[in-house]
Amino acid sequence: MSKHNWTLETQLVHNPFKTDGGTGAVSVPIQHASTFHQSSFEEFGAYDYSRSGTPTRTALEETIAALEGGTRGFAFSSGMAAISTAFLLLSQGDHVLVTEDVYGGTFRMVTEVLTRFGIEHTFVDMTDRNEVARSIKPNTKVIYMETPSNPTLGITDIKAVVQLAKENGCLTFLDNTFMTPALQRPLDLGVDIVLHSATKFLSGHSDVLSGLAAVKDEELGKQLYKLQNAFGAVLGVQDCWLVLRGLKTLQVRLEKASQTAQRLAEFFQKHPAVKRVYYPGLADHPGAETHKSQSTGAGAVLSFELESKEAVKKLVENVSLPVFAVSLGAVESILSYPATMSHAAMPKEEREKRGITDGLLRLSVGVEHADDLEHDFEQALKEIAPVSVR
C-alpha cells in the first residue's frame, strides 16, 4: 500500500514531520525563536518573524491541511481566533447567514462585534434548505455552518448548502470541531473554509488553547494567510507541539468515546427522568440519515434535557466521573451547562427559541469505561424524581 492510500489513523502517527531530518528525533522540534537570521541581503529565507511563521507551526499547519484534504492550513491562538480571522474576509455592508443554534462565542462575535463594523447577519435553521435559500440576500457573502451544531446537534446537509452558496456567489465556512477530519471532511463536500477549536478533540487533553483552519482553494489560502499575519492571533510553538502530539491519538480516542456516547445516548433515551436526547447516532434523530451520508460516525458529544434547572443542579451535584466544566473533546468526560457556560452570551429568550433550555446538559464523552460512566449517571439520576414514563 502506498503512503497515499494509508488510512487516517496511520497518517495521524506517520505524518511528514514524524522525525527531525537533522537529528532523527521522533518528535517535531520546538523552535522558540522570535526572529530568524537572513544569510542573504537580497533574498530572505522561508522564515523571518515568528508571527509570520515558524517551523513548528508549519508542521501543524501542513498536517491539518493534509488531514482535511486541503492545500493550506492555519494555526491560531484559539478556535475563536480562527473564526474571527475568517470573518475578516467580510467588509462593511456584507451579510452573513449563520446556523441558529451556533456556539455562544460565535454568536457573540457575530452579534456584538461584526455588527459594529457594519456587517449584517441572519440566524437561520440551517437544517431547512428552503429557509436558507429564502434568507440569502444580494449582499450575502458567507454562509456559516456548524454540523452537528452546538449544543442541540442539528444536522445541516452540507452539499445542499454549498450548492446554494455557489449559486449565489457566497463562501461557506464550517466549524468541524465536533467531528474532526476523522469523521467528516467538509472540504471534500465543497466547503471553502473548515474551522476547528483544536482545544477540543484534535489536541484531546484539556491542556492547550488552539484553533485551526484549512482551505482547498489556493487563492483563498493566500487571502486568509494575509489576514492571519496581519491580525496576528497565531499559535505559539509550544502549543503547536501539544496539538501535534494530541493528533497522533485522535482516531483511537474518538472511536472509543463515540462508542460510549452511542451507548449513553440510548441509556438516556430510555430513562424516565430524561425528557429528550440530542445525538445523531440515534435512529429517531431528524438528521440521522443526512449525517450518515456526509460523515463516518456520530461523534462523542451528546446533549440531554431534564425537567428543570433544579434537576440539572441535582444531577451535577451527584455525578462523580465527568468534570463539570466548559469545553469538550478531552480524554475525561466533560459535563457542561450551556445556559451558563457555552451559551452564556446568548439572551435567555434566544436560547430557548433554539431549544437551549434551563434543563439542557451537554456531555462530551471521554475514554473512561462505558460501564463506569453509565453506572455513574444511573446513580445520579436516581436522585431526580421521574418526570415521564416511556
UniProtKB/Swiss-Prot annotation:
Cofactor (UniProt): pyridoxal 5'-phosphate
Q: Which SUPFAM superfamilies match?
A: PLP-dependent transferases
Q: What is the lineage of its organism?
A: Bacteria, Bacillati, Bacillota, Bacilli, Bacillales
List, alphabetically, the PANTHER family matched. CYSTATHIONINE BETA-LYASE, TRANS-SULFURATION ENZYME FAMILY MEMBER
Q: What reaction(s) does this enzyme catalyze? A: L,L-cystathionine + H2O = L-homocysteine + pyruvate + NH4(+); an S-substituted L-cysteine + H2O = a thiol + pyruvate + NH4(+)
Q: Provide the species name.
A: Bacillus subtilis (strain 168)
Summary of the knockout phenotype? Cells lacking this gene grow as well as the wild-type in the presence of sulfate, cysteine, homocysteine or methionine as sole sulfur source, but do not grow in the presence of cystathionine.
Q: Which Gene Ontology terms describe the biological processes this protein takes part in?
A: methionine biosynthetic process; transsulfuration
Similarity comment text for this entry: Belongs to the trans-sulfuration enzymes family.
Q: What induces it?
A: Up-regulated at the transcriptional level when sulfate, cysteine, cystathionine or homocysteine are the sulfur sources. Repressed by methionine.
InterPro entries according to UniProt: Cys/Met-Metab_PyrdxlP-dep_enz, Cys_met_metab_PP, PyrdxlP-dep_Trfase, PyrdxlP-dep_Trfase_major, PyrdxlP-dep_Trfase_small
EC no. given is 4.4.1.13
Q: What would you give as a GO molecular function for this chain, any one?
A: pyridoxal phosphate binding
Kindly report the protein's main subcellular placement as a broad class: cytoplasm
UniProt name for this protein? Cystathionine beta-lyase MetC
Keyword line: Amino-acid biosynthesis, Cytoplasm, Lyase, Methionine biosynthesis, Pyridoxal phosphate
Quaternary data: Homotetramer.
In what pathway does it function?
Answer: Amino-acid biosynthesis; L-methionine biosynthesis via de novo pathway; L-homocysteine from L-cystathionine: step 1/1
- Can you list the GO cellular component terms from the UniProt entry? cytoplasm
UniProt-annotated location(s) = Cytoplasm
- Give the superkingdom in one word: Bacteria
Name positions with the PTM N6-(pyridoxal phosphate)lysine: K200
User: What task does this protein carry out?
Assistant: Catalyzes the transformation of cystathionine into homocysteine. Also exhibits cysteine desulfhydrase activity in vitro, producing sulfide from cysteine.
Gene this protein is translated from? metC
